[in-house]
Amino acid sequence: MFNQKIIEQASGKLTGSLTKSSSLVSIEKERDACGVGFIADVNNIANHKIVVQALEALTCMEHRGACSADRDSGDGAGITTAIPWNLFQSGLKDKGIIIQKNESIGVGMLFLPTSKLQESKKIIENVLKEENLEVVGWRLVPTVEEVLGKQAYLNKPHVEQMFCRSSNLSKNELEQQLFLVRKKIERYIGINGKEWAHEFYVCSLSCYTIVYKGMMRSAVLGQFYQDLYHSEYTSSFAIYHRRFSTNTMPKWPLAQPMRFISHNGEINTLLGNLNWMRSREPLLKSPIWKNRIDELKPITNKDNSDSANLDAAVELLIASGRSAEEALMILVPEAFQNQPEFNKNTEISDFYEYYSGLQEPWDGPALVVFTDGKVIGATLDRNGLRPARYVITKDNLVIVSSESGVVQVEPSNIKSKGRLGPGQMISVDIISHKILNNKEIKTSVAGKTPYGDLLKESRQILGHQAFFSEQQVESKKLMQLQTAFGYTNEDVELVIEHMASQGKEPTFCMGDDIPLAILSEKSHILYDYFKQRFAQVTNPAIDPLRESLVMSLTIQIGHKSNLLDDQPVLAKHIKLDSPIINEGELNAILESKLSCAHINTIFKVEKGPNDFKKQIEQLCESASQAILSGNNILILSDKNDILESEKVSIPPLLAAGAVHHHLINKGLRQDASIIIETAQCWSTHHFACLIGYGASAICPYLAFETARHWWSNPKTKMLMSKGRLPACNIQEAQANYKKAVEAGLLKILSKMGISLLSSYHGAQIFEILGLGSEVVNFAFKGTTSQIGGLSMEELGQETVNIHSKAFSQVKTKKLANYGFVQYRPGGEYHINNPEMSKALHQAVRGYNPEYYNSYQRLLQNRPPTALRDLLKLKSNKQPIAIDKVESMENILHKFCTGGMSLGALSRETHETLAIAMNRIGGKSNSGEGGEDPVRFKVLNDVNESGNSDLLPHLKGLRNGDTASSAIKQIASGRFGVTPEYLMNAKQLEIKIAQGAKPGEGGQLPGKKISPYIATLRKCKPGVPLISPPPHHDIYSIEDLSQLIFDLHQINPTAKISVKLVSEIGIGTIAAGVAKGNADIIQISGHDGGTGASPLSSIKHAGSPWELGLSEVHQLLAENQLRDRVTLRVDGGLRTGSDIVLAAIMGAEEFGFGTIAMIATGCIMARICHTNKCPVGVATQREELRARFSGVPEALVNFFLFIGNEVREILASLGYKSLDEITGQNHLLIKNTDIELAKTRGIELNSLININTHTWTKFNSVHTNGPVMDDDILAIPEINDAIKLENEVAKHFKIANTNRTVGTRLSGVIAQKYGNEGFKGLIKLNFYGSAGQSFGAFLASGVNLKLMGEANDYVGKGMNGGSIIIVPPAGTTYEDNNQVIIGNTCLYGATGGYLFAQGQAGERFAVRNSLAKSVVEGVGDHACEYMTGGTIVVLGKAGRNVGAGMTGGLAYFLDEENKFIERVNSEIVKVQRVITKAGEQQLKNLIENHSAKTGSLKAHNILENWNTYLPQFWQVVPPSEANIEETNTAYSSNTITAY
């Protein structure tokens, strides 16, 4: 035991964070990730070795987990095995208890409250007695508490096992009975022990399996639970799990495995899944449960984690008679719509199609390992976003794990090796002694029932109906309708008309600089109070354009059937290919066999806003009555023949949400679908909101009518005739609009990492800004609304205000333009207005304090725009003299510029910003796109005119200046990220998201790719460059931790920052980032600028930094993590007052983007996305760049003004430094002098009056600890080779725990020689299983050879050298059919060679720039976003080859003639090798591969060249179409015949 002093110390330091939950965090916001796997003996031979191997495997994945604030208490580790009867028998014998073989006995592994031990055991025993089960006995689990970390120890439950038996039930019957028993126990304890119920938890209660787990590190699990290393603890299988949680509050029950599953990943759709499961409960029936089904409810629990809830859903299905494999197929389905293999196995797609109408997918990155004690298996999510490698041995072991090499197997004992692909499953049936692959499992499950016949009987597919070909209302009435429903001129011209013309969403630039809807004096429609949420860190966004094969907008409407039916029956329903339906399609639904109720959503104004809620309640009652009358489609419609001033439409979002939740509460939600027929829906955000709150389909009749009027306008037809607009007919215009909305919807889904509309439907993945609890609880229950806002009455009044404008006495010929998007005099206030910009330009160009004071006054006297405008400062201290305040220099060091890329900005602007920031000791940020090495030099040749030959295009220079950005960004495209780039940084920023478009990637158009930009980005001029929505090496929190490790590895002196965007739940994400060893966390507000972004993203994604920063600071402080990181904030900072307020909320550093550009010369023309910037700031056109007049001095002056203002405010508050006020929220009070036009219901409690925590300021750089590269660099011969540029060769053993090998060595070389200068040769030979990121950022002159296998990210960012990977000696399996390297290899590689004698995983060569490689098979998405280099694949390829590929060449051997269907042909074309140059390029690489690896496959191809050459395909993007390797017109030698 710990001694008392240690316990007291731990209590003093930690108890506050352990016993009090954060005000800003709940379990729903907690995120986790992990390492997971299983070992199973196919022959079901139980032995102790399997348990020991599982514990060792767990230890080998310790790096995938994390620890609590004490750095010792693990976030969780655990193991599931068969029940070790021999061990228990010997222990129970001492108590006189004998267990007979094959007796029906269950074992409960229990966490019991130490203070209520006897009370809880009494409840358990009473329930068992009620259920006619005998309590055989109790067993205290032997534990060693000393090995626990402090937090884990302080929160340790009492761990005891309970044995019970049945005299009349079979084992399977007892297993089902124990499910009922557990639910009953939990319910009784919830009623009788409310105060301590949270301390009670059933790890497992089964007659087949048992779970040992807890809040501990991997190595501690077997030390704590003494049973696990007992020789009599035998099992034929073991599942193991190591957890990485974003939260540090110790929760023993959240450790995994759960009762049936272990889960690595995150369920993005959790809230929707919970809502739908609750709504599904009234329908649940099963003969197994007879009349006791209600005792199982609730099935899920919003207070549990996503993994626990998925486990509960799996448990329900298994206990109700489904196999474990079938349960997972139903809940986590494969992407079946675009699978060529299913064309021959339609029964599988029929199965998935059938269940898509009953159960929405639990969507998100997931490797799920599962067992019911009879079958052990694993399945991967539809996108394949988690790694899963397997080995099958000759002695019949199956090993599946997140990483290869965690279980040691002799090479000669390996029968086969592989990986699970997207949506695939593997299982081991230990009863029938079978290993089942994906096809066998799914064919077996799907073949049991004729699902195709059931679909034919019950499903109607809604065919496309023609759009109206004529206008339905006259122009005058149209404008009145548009006004009544809240349209503005911008909505029509910038949104609807653009979409009708172009078929895509409008793009805009800069950011959202108008007041939040709740702060605005102008009326806003309800949608404007909702902000879209998005994926960052804990799960990835998806690319809806390049990965459309996994996405679908399909939805089914009608009555839902019972999920538990043992004889499947599907209710009549209609399948829609899209939730956006036109008037004809709505009529077709009305005329279908389904019963439809048309419910009007008009309320009468004469009763006043007071009656608003009552009339919506009447609407809800009408909906439930319609269902009880037999209707299974509810059409909520605001369509009225006559528009009247006294009859106002209930906002459709309010109507949808209110009816949706009302029906859930009444138990009727599954009986009908909701369709919205509305005029008030036109932007993609509107559609997303309606679907998110329960609508299955929307008919936006007024938007379609607006498109028809636009097409009919003579001006439109004239522009079409002149070619200034694309020509289309009236129906095509409406189709274009619909197409744009659908594409926008897919983007909104994908930015949250969701693939299917059915998973987004009802998921409520939004954050509310400006609605009070009355409104939220009524119609949007479960959605976070942190700041309160409008009451029902106030919302009713705003609704009436919008409607009444349609009946104004003032007659106009055009719709009102309030300037919500573009600044206009008299319109909505924009912070970035001409008056402000002019004052700032005048202030900084000559350091004029008078003009700065004018600038300051303009911002101080603005209308309330941001949340901070509602606050004011209050200090109990006396003011001090300004000379007592910290120096200007100290303050300036805390300033940074935002990450603005060279490419979006001109070279002149980018370098001017960097020079200015270096002068003041601040930090500029490179943004994405690399940096010219010339900028790393210090200027010493500046003449009296301020010019330098080194940077001749700049003005106002000084000797000693440097244009190197102190912060180098690593974004998803990895453009220009080389070893030299990384080594010339003081900080390395991982950009996860951008404030103006979080969850989205980017695209730099070809017209901005000048020769200079192309050189930096390692691509060809004029070729568009795509930055993926996610980092393809960050799909989870432990992946981010790995990238942080990689960057600390190459440059151990640089701090690593992670840029996040403010949203609800960011605190838990930040906690995970801090635990992942980041040095800096940056929180960006929603109002940050951008060079180009969809308009709907600028307006509707992200939240204010005030909320995000406060949440992050508070949660980190409460969880003892605040001293691990520096917090930086950006997004609309413009004054010293902003800096002080941000510091009080927790910020220590401050980023400036838009305002820094304005100070440097930007005039806010807001045309950045066009490449036509009139002042040369945001363009690559040379004639426009020549107009750039900015000099570093102007930006220096701006920051001097800001710094001086900060010092003045600090002095007035009585504080000497920013550090003294950091996180001191008590200095903020609500400014009661400000009265908002709309409400007095704003609540700022999350920003003010918060407990102040103390912490030690973080200054140092985190380290990776001892690593293999340190040992390599400690070898004198290696050092000599670097110093003298000699050749040296060394040999090493390697394990999966040796990560990022070769990278620190590469950093040392790049620091000394740059990317190209090293002329020596360092050969390193390894034997074993390499950890992640083997050879990442490899430098020229370093050759790595591995005899064994490697995990994910091989060659990530490599710039030179070579990586050769071959199977170990003694292998007898066929090399080319085995997986030898993991996922996402060669990501962002800028050079070098990779030869792998085996298959690669998913996303091979993603965003490859210049590397060349040969591998012998690849998974899905090979060569995605590739911009250069050459890839050869000598084996099978997965789907979606070449998606987003704009450069480079790839050759694929197609022996089965199936390759063409696997190519994404949106950009690339596929052809045979038709020129001698192409043939020679291919042959040379294969010859190299053969020579380097000894590949038999390569040797055979070369020996039979004329036979194999015709079987190769060449994948050619447009940029490579006219070169000698691809085009006979450019080649002197062509291949005329084979």
UniProtKB/Swiss-Prot annotation:
- Extent of the signal sequence: none
Q: Which residues bind [3Fe-4S] cluster?
A: 1162, 1168, 1173
Q: Does the keyword Chloroplast apply?
A: yes
Cross-referenced SUPFAM superfamilies, in alphabetical order?
Answer: Alpha subunit of glutamate synthase, C-terminal domain, FMN-linked oxidoreductases, N-terminal nucleophile aminohydrolases (Ntn hydrolases)
Cofactor: how and how many bound: Binds 1 [3Fe-4S] cluster.
GO molecular-function terms, A-Z: 3 iron, 4 sulfur cluster binding; glutamate synthase (ferredoxin) activity; metal ion binding
Location relative to the cell: Plastid, Chloroplast stroma
- A Pfam match: GXGXG
Active site as annotated: 34 (for gatase activity)
Organism domain of life: Eukaryota
Q: Which keywords does this chain's UniProt record carry?
A: 3Fe-4S, Amino-acid biosynthesis, Chloroplast, FAD, Flavoprotein, FMN, Glutamate biosynthesis, Glutamine amidotransferase, Iron, Iron-sulfur, Metal-binding, Oxidoreductase, Plastid
EC number(s) recorded for this UniProt protein: 1.4.7.1
Glutamine amidotransferase type-2 domain location is 34-431
What family name appears in the similarity comment? Belongs to the glutamate synthase family.
> What is the annotated quaternary arrangement, including any partners?
Monomer.
Per its record, how is this protein called by name?
A: Ferredoxin-dependent glutamate synthase
Q: Which organism is it from?
A: Porphyra purpurea (Red seaweed)
